[in-house]
């Protein structure tokens, strides 16, 4: 019989608690800890007050390619790569720290909205890139690094910030900050006033 380490079990419980707090799905918890499914479900119920959601994990790379999700996924992945290269952390710890950085930059709305990129999707994104299904690619216009399908031809990718889809303009709300307003819109208003 293999003896379980009490220290390792305590670390797994602490990690599971942090992942549950950030919104991880049960499959992610099972993959990243050595705790039994039953213990994870009990821990989830204790922390969240409800059982974990049922269903399969996202398995399609297409979700990461739509304009808004791509921007958020790319922001997370760039933070992930930076932390990974720094060498101060590894494994799921890098995913958690990068996700916390992402949440600092893209906080959920005040209405209790969920963030656009959930922790489990961020974790799945890392797995997709590691398996070669997705890759980071440089935008030929702005030079930013964005997530694309694997084997994207070199110098052919234009990000959705440089070339936003028409529906993106409809969703955008103008900021009250003068530096954030679009000068073309202001010029258009000035011409209409004359």
From Swiss-Prot:
It comes from the Bacteria. The keyword Transferase does not apply. GO terms for biological process: bacterial-type flagellum organization; positive regulation of DNA-templated transcription; regulation of bacterial-type flagellum assembly. GO terms for molecular function: DNA binding; zinc ion binding. The keyword tRNA processing does not apply. One of its GO terms (cellular component) is cytoplasm. Functions in complex with FlhD as a master transcriptional regulator that regulates transcription of several flagellar and non-flagellar operons by binding to their promoter region. Activates expression of class 2 flagellar genes, including fliA, which is a flagellum-specific sigma factor that turns on the class 3 genes. Also regulates genes whose products function in a variety of physiological pathways. NCBIfam families: PRK12722.1. This is Flagellar transcriptional regulator FlhC. It comes from Xenorhabdus nematophila. The gene is flhC.
């Amino acid at each position: 019989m293999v003896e379980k380490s009490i220290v390792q079990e305590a670390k797994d419980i602490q990690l599971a608690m942090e992942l549950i707090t950030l919104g991880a799905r049960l499959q992610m918890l099972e993959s990243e800890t050595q705790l039994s499914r039953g213990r994870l479900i009990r821990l989830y119920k204790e922390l969240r007050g409800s059982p974990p959601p049922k269903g399969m994990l996202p398995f399609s790379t297409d979700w990461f390619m739509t304009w808004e999700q791509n921007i958020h996924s790319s922001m997370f992945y760039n933070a992930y790569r930076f932390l990974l290269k720094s060498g101060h952390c590894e494994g799921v710890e890098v995913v958690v720290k990068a996700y916390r950085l992402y949440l600092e930059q893209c906080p959920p709305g005040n209405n209790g909205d969920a963030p656009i990129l959930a922790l489990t999707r961020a974790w799945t994104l890392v797995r997709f890139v590691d398996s070669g299904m997705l890759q980071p690619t440089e935008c030929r216009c702005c030079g930013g690094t964005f997530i694309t399908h694997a084997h994207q031809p070199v110098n052919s990718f234009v990000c959705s910030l440089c070339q936003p889809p028409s529906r993106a303009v409809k969703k955008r709300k103008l900021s009250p900050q003068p530096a954030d307003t679009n000068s073309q819109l202001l010029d258009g208003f000035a011409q209409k006033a004359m």
